[in-house]
């Protein structure tokens, strides 16, 4: 199990919008619980970036890495469309037959895994007659302002204008007809941007990559299971590399072409354990030392129980 948490200083980002009201594009916000100066709890609404958005960015990086490493990628995943074998119409495009019954579910899962590393690492849900689910091996949460630094988080709408000089707006000395709509010389729009000290957590269950999760029914073909086993090391490397690129490139989110954030990785903590463990979130500057203390205690607990 690989677990990590990071603190990032991000200025002027519009990575995750939720809706457009007229000419106003809103940033995603969510409620969090913080301590106030009187040491009591209160609710604050703050800018956030959803885990869905971050996971999409991770899987996009995973696709690119798998292509470079010669690992299999499905038809839709190769287009960065992560619908992941969810319906029969998509299965036919991927060349995979749906599960006939419960005994056929392992065969179906293994067919999907051998066809697409993204479905292996990121999970999938087939919603046909005999539904099949594979839980994602990558777990990411919302990127939120650090709870001890929520005063360093703000939202503001930025005013923008697109101007069409070559075809000025009709109306000034020229009446528009019924068939000729007025041309707008100015197009006004507002985009809400955020700045904050963000924290982001992620876990990667490396040991379960390239391992079928369905343990019942008729076993899958031995040749396909052997193929997964032979690719296991490469698939793990690809998943870990994509996680590293996610934090090093910050290639995740919306409006990167005109609202590329001014971002800086302040600190990061990473653990690798043989047992389930999640690092302490980067809500305060002491999260690295807190993680070290916790992982030492967890290791001691497993050793006393005779678990390495």
Regions found by a protein language model. Name each.
Residues 73-76:
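Non-heme di-metal
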Residues 1-46, 63, 67-70, 80-308:
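Basic polyanion-binding and macromolecular-assembly surfaces
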Residues 45-59:
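Active/ligand-binding-proximal structured segments within catalytic/core domains
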């Amino acid at each position: 199990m690989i677990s990590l948490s990071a603190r990032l200083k991000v200025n002027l980002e519009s990575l995750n919008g939720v809706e457009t009201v007229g000419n106003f594009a809103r940033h995603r916000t969510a409620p969090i619980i913080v301590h106030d100066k009187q040491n009591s709890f209160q609710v604050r609404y703050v800018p956030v970036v959803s885990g869905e958005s971050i996971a999409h960015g991770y899987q996009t990086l995973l696709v690119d890495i798998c292509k470079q490493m010669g690992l299999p990628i499905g038809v839709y995943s190769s287009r960065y469309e992560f619908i992941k074998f969810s319906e029969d119409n998509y299965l036919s495009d991927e060349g995979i037959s749906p599960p006939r019954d419960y005994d056929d579910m392992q065969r179906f899962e293994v067919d999907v895994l051998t066809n697409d590393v993204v479905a292996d690492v990121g999970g999938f849900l087939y919603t046909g007659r005999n539904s099949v689910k594979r839980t994602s091996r990558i777990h990411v949460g919302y990127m939120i302002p650090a709870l001890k630094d929520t005063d360093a988080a703000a939202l503001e709408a930025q005013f923008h204008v697109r101007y069409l000089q070559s075809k000025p707006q009709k109306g000034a000395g020229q009446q528009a007809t019924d068939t000729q709509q007025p041309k707008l010389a100015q197009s006004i729009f507002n985009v809400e941007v955020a700045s904050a000290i963000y924290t982001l957590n992620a876990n990667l269950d490396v040991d379960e990559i390239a391992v079928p999760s369905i343990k019942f029914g008729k076993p899958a073909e031995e040749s396909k299971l052997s193929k997964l086993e032979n690719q296991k090391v490469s698939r793990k490397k690809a998943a870990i590399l994509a996680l590293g690129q996610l934090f090093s490139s910050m290639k995740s989110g919306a409006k990167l072409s005109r609202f590329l954030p001014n971002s800086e990785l302040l600190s990061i903590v990473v653990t690798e354990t043989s047992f389930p463990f999640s690092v302490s979130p980067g809500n305060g500057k002491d999260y690295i030392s807190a993680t070290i203390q916790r992982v030492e205690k967890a290791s001691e607990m497993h050793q006393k129980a005779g678990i390495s």
